[in-house]
């Protein structure tokens, strides 16, 4: 693990505005009721000393919260904090702008830098690793020797062939070959006053860091070692099928909660995105490929905020297309040429069938 989010010891190092962070604390107290200082620090994923204690002091000074009692902890972190009437009004104003009340986000610039430092480009598989990962599958040596360069190229891969021949199994095996490391992703991303929720418990699997249980002392150790706004996960392997549409490839804005959900390809950064049953989506294959052309070639993606502003994110994803349909029935030759590696997973030969 080469990348480790540097620890935060001052508010300035978060890259976030102090008033924005104070509003986040008020929203959490509004939703959850009175909490200890240490618990507030745990919820917003920032260290108590030097960051959360400063926020709480400022809020006390403005009479937006008050100290109820001590919960037997050491210092201010053990005190129980409660929101005041004025604090409730301020929290409601903040909630009209955004109802996000989770871990403090990481600025987009920091996220993009982290993606580059944890890039898949440096990952390589050997013939031995491939044979180990594919040992449960039977196919020709020709197919085997085409898969290796495709995986190591970190370019798009197009798997095609009749149904039941193992295309999805091959894609999953690719994941077991190259997604063995862990990476850090932020719980959420901050850009232009907007929050994009990044961590997704369905698509992201947490990779333990030594402390299996989240105790107060464990949180303090994590805060001392690295920025707790980041979560360590296994490199993602995300599958999307017929439900995929063009809207799902851009930021999804929740009109009620007033924050965004990251699209599939952003959640898959640092890993693999498998487009299963390609050609059976709710969008034409040519339109879908058109959406990928710039990201696939430039390793940069452009997403649109509801304000109309476009933001730039790193595109570090191995895209694998899998289809039962003949490639030429899906898109024209010009589009197919843009897909670097086209590999047919054909019917087994007589000898392979006997081995199966």
Describe each region flagged by the PLM:
Residues 2-25:
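Short alpha-helical segments that sit at the start of domains
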Residues 116-144:
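Dynamic helix-loop-helix/coil hinge segments at AAA+ ATPase domain boundaries and subdomain interfaces
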Residues 135-320:
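Conserved ASCE/P-loop NTPase catalytic core
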Residues 331-347:
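A short helix-turn-beta junction within AAA+ P-loop NTPase domains corresponding to the substrate/partner-engaging
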């Amino acid at each position: 693990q080469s990348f480790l989010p540097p620890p935060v010891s001052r508010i300035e190092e978060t890259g976030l505005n102090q008033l924005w962070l104070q509003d986040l604390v008020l929203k959490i107290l509004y939703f959850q009721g009175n909490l200890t200082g240490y618990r507030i620090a745990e919820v917003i994923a920032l260290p108590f000393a030097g960051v959360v204690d400063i926020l709480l002091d400022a809020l006390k000074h403005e009479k937006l919260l008050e100290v109820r009692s001590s919960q037997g902890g050491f210092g201010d972190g053990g005190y129980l904090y409660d929101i005041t009437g004025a604090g409730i009004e301020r929290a409601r104003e903040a909630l009209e702008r955004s109802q996000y009340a989770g871990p403090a986000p990481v600025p987009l610039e920091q996220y993009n830098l982290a993606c580059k430092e944890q890039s898949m480009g440096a990952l390589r598989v050997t013939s031995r690793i491939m044979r180990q990962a594919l040992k449960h599958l039977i196919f020709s040596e020709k197919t085997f020797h085409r898969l290796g360069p495709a995986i190591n190229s970190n370019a798009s891969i197009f798997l095609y062939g009749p149904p039941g021949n193992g295309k999805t199994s091959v894609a999953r095996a690719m994941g077991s070959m190259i997604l063995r490391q862990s990476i850090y992703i932020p719980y959420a991303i901050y850009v232009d006053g907007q929050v994009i929720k990044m961590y997704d418990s369905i698509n992201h699997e947490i990779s333990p860091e030594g402390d299996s249980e989240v105790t107060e002392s464990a949180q303090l150790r994590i805060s001392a070692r690295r920025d707790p706004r980041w979560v360590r996960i296994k490199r993602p392997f995300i599958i999307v099928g017929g439900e995929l549409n063009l809207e799902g490839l851009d930021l999804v804005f929740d009109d009620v909660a007033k924050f965004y959900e990251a699209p599939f390809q952003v959640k898959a950064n640092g890993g693999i995105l498998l487009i299963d049953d390609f050609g059976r989506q709710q969008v034409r294959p040519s339109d879908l490929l058109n959406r990928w052309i710039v990201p696939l070639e430039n390793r940069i993606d452009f997403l649109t905020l509801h304000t109309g502003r476009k933001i730039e994110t790193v595109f570090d994803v191995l895209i694998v297309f899998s289809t039962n349909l003949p490639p030429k029935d899906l898109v024209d030759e010009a589009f197919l040429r843009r897909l670097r590696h086209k590999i047919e997973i054909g019917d087994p030969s007589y000898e392979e069938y006997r081995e199966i």
